[in-house]
Amino acid sequence: MELKTMYFDTNNTMYLKVVSKKFVDKLNEGYNYLDDEYKIATLDITDDLFYKCSDDCVRECFNNDSSAHLRMRKTANELVSFTDYKNVFGQLRKDSVFVLQVFPKFDDPEFQMQEITDGNHGTIYKANRFYLGEKFDLGDVEVVKFFIKKGTDIHLHYDSIQRWAFDNRKTEVSMYLFGFSFVRGLDNFKVLAKICRDGNLELLRLLELNGFNETIKLYAIILSYISFQPLLTNYLLTKSYNFQKSNITVSNWKATMPYGTIDQYKTKVLLMAIANNHAELVQYLLTQNPSDKDINHAMLYAVTTANASLLDYTLKNGGNIHYKNDQALILAVRFNHISMVRKLICLGMDSNNVFALTMAAENNHQDIVQHLINRGADVNANNRSALIAAVKNGHLKIVQMFVNNGADIKIDDTVIKTACKNGHNNIVKYLLGKGVSCDDIVLPSNSSFFSIVKLAVKRSIIVNNDKSNKIK
């Protein structure tokens, strides 16, 4: 493979920029296809956001420089970062998709360029004037091979490129990278977890060839099982001495583990079991001398799944009901588990939790809102944030709950203005009927918000005819 070189500047220096698909899509919005080969446009960019140029700009660019692919100009003195062949893999992020050629425009009188050394990612360059050339797909193993051939430091950035390949399910790239001799230092469990998540049998076999010991093999069985990957599970069972295909259970797996090895990856397995909703495995791991963190993770899992018995078990064994700033109550509200909300409050959690009340109001969880109010939640706390959330999202019944329990809707025009702004005419009608004045709403006469209220008045939506409700 050979990358095209374009001679845009006297120095003929090429760099590389790793970009996401979103970045390229923004570029494509500005592309104007004049023929099959050249994409010509002049773009101004700010913070990596690209704006489509006019046809006049395109014609001017085409007439002045018919060899250009894409010319980019940075607004003001802002700089765009890029790198070189050696460090290109150090710039990878999970959403990276392409590598673009970058040619600094050294002959531009406003050209600026910086060079920054980063111990983790290698050398980074920044410039405000440059051309972009070809784009190359990182998922193409031939592109990866080419970069390595051109001097990419695979030893320094191996973890970065291999992690990217796993996260983006680029099997061919992963298999090629496994061929390097220094791979034996890789975290086998981390790689194994990703393989089991994806159900990739090819990579599982390749991992075996690169140091798949008996302990890792046994973990692989349970990880494939809790990841719902029967193809991998059945493959691993054919290589295990202690499992029967028809009887994959936690106790069976436990019996096969060499003494002491269960603790090695216990927390990681626990988190995977929680993520995949395997209550049996969660409960078993909690009997294996769990750390405080393990117990609290399991407690939060019990709340999100409304598992009362598991919640009781975790609390009995040291779980902290207030872990991570009362996350248990927040999760119970988020997942609309009224039974968990009741239980947690009975266990001593503060019902006057503004964030919990606001979240319940925002998501129209009426039973939870009523229960929190009944247990003493302040409906006017934090500048009436819960009330405003209900109004903003158009939840009339919850607004009525708040008003019936003392919410202050007349202290200023925030509540009715929010209802107007979001077009909730039923709430506007209700508020006006409750005596909220619209005289003091400070909005321009041509405002759509103002028009909504005016329309409400014209159509006799107001329940009472108090002068304070009229708009002149």
Swiss-Prot record:
Repeat keyword on record: yes
Listed Gene3D superfamilies: Ankyrin repeat-containing domain
ANK repeats: 125-156, 187-216, 265-295, 297-323, 325-351, 352-381, 382-411, 413-440
InterPro entries registered for this protein in UniProt: Ankyrin_rpt (IPR002110), Ankyrin_rpt-contain_sf (IPR036770)
Signal peptide bounds: none
A Pfam family that the UniProt record links to this protein: Ank_2
Keyword Transmembrane: no
Keywords: ANK repeat, Repeat
Protein name: Putative ankyrin repeat protein L675
Lineage, opening ranks: Viruses, Varidnaviria, Bamfordvirae, Nucleocytoviricota, Megaviricetes
